[in-house]
């Protein structure tokens, strides 16, 4: 019988196959221990998302919401959302509810790049201060819970952080001074908390920020001038705070600003003409302040406003004629001011209801019942 000899090519394949097998890593035992401690501080009774987190399975391969580095076996991502299109939510036909707190053991996951534990409605306690030791962290999203306490004072140590979302919690205290060291930050959302104090004067050093959502807090002081240098800023929401002073003229020079919400503050003075002539601005809500003067007559063929709300101020004078030359105005509310004169006819006024003009000093004409 002829003896079968392995060819050089088949031997090479065997070496490659063995090499590939050798680099497939299982979950780091240290990380698995940290995840078990993390799980033990949380309770999710409805969906059973922790059912896959078994001692007998590999956390990198079978644990819901966990991702690992394929080479090192270190845990890199925890992604657990209480509202999701994932099959586990669709099958249950409901959003999730989770209670408990964030165990400091999560800080032992030193390769973590993303920590998402959002929209569970019932997670309480404070953010562990040691979270600032996770040097690789790029995403921290804990929105939609009942987390208390302050933003960790040393948050600025997270030099790679790109997303910080702590919205819709019960947090207090001021914006830490170190936060302005997060030079990679692109998205900051602290909406609907109890954050106090002023916006840091050097806030504009966050040059990469495109979204700043700080509405529904207790912020005071004025809008820092340093924000004028944030050339990537597209969305700025400071609504429902206690911001005072004038709307800065430089806001009209922010080329990519598309959403500006300053509703329900204590802003005074006139509306800068440069702001309303900014052709990139899509949504502007300046309502419920103490703004005075006339509505700037600066609209034109490049004006494209999805929504313009100037209601509940002390604006006087006439509705500017140039508004009729705007390319598009979807929603307009100038009610509850001191405006006078005839409401222009034609676009965009022909599709607006009386509520857009009500409670002014002496406006007249359609759609109001007051004739001129």
From Swiss-Prot:
Asked if the record carries the keyword Zinc, the reply is no
User: Per the record's keyword annotation, is DNA repair included, yes or no?
Assistant: yes
A Gene Ontology cellular component where this protein is annotated is: chloroplast
The record's keywords, sorted A to Z, are: DNA damage, DNA repair, Leucine-rich repeat, Repeat, Signal
Q: Name one GO molecular function term.
A: nucleotide binding
The residue spans of each LRR repeat are 136-158, 160-183, 184-205, 208-230, 232-254, 256-277, 280-302, 304-326, 328-350
The stretch of residues making up the signal peptide is: 1-26
User: Which BP terms from GO are recorded?
Assistant: DNA repair
The record describes the protein's role as: This protein is able to complement bacterial recA mutations, but its native function in the plant is not known.
Name this protein carries in UniProt: DNA damage-repair/toleration protein DRT100
User: Which source organism does the UniProt entry give?
Assistant: Arabidopsis thaliana (Mouse-ear cress)
Q: Which gene encodes it?
A: DRT100
């Amino acid at each position: 019988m002829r003896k079968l000899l392995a060819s050089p090519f088949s031997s090479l394949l065997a070496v490659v196959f063995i090499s590939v097998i050798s680099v497939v890593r299982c979950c780091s035992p240290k990380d698995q221990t940290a995840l078990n401690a993390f799980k033990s501080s949380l309770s999710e009774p409805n969906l059973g998302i922790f059912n896959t987190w078994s001692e007998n399975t590999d956390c990198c391969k079978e644990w819901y919401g966990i991702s690992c580095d394929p080479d090192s076996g270190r845990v890199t991502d925890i992604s657990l959302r209480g509202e999701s299109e994932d099959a586990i939510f669709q099958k249950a036909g409901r959003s999730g509810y989770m209670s408990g707190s964030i165990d400091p053991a999560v800080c032992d996951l030193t390769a973590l790049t993303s920590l998402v534990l959002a929209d569970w409605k019932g997670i309480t306690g404070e953010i562990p201060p040691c979270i600032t030791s996770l040097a690789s962290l790029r995403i921290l999203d804990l929105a939609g819970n009942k987390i208390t306490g302050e933003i960790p004072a040393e948050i600025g140590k997270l030099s790679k952080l790109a997303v910080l979302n702590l919205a819709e919690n019960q947090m207090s205290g001021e914006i830490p001074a170190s936060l302005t060291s997060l030079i990679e930050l692109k998205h900051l959302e602290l909406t609907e908390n109890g954050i106090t104090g002023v916006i840091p004067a050097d806030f504009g050093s966050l040059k990469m920020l495109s979204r700043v959502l700080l509405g529904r807090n207790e912020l005071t002081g004025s809008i820092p001038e340093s924000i004028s240098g944030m050339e990537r800023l597209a969305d700025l929401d400071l609504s429902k705070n206690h911001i005072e002073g004038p709307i800065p003229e430089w806001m009209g020079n922010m080329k990519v600003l598309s959403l500006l919400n300053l509703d329900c503050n204590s802003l005074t003075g006139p509306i800068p003409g440069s702001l309303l002539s900014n052709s990139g601005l899509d949504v502007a809500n300046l309502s419920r302040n103490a703004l005075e003067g006339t509505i700037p007559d600066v609209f034109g063929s490049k004006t494209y406003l999805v929504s313009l709300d100037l209601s509940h101020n002390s604006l006087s004078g006439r509705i500017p004629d140039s508004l009729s030359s705007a390319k598009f105005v979807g929603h307009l509310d100038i009610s509850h001011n001191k405006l006078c004169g005839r409401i222009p006819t034609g676009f965009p006024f022909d599709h607006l209801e009386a509520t857009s003009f009500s409670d002014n000093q002496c406006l007249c004409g359609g759609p109001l019942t007051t004739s001129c």
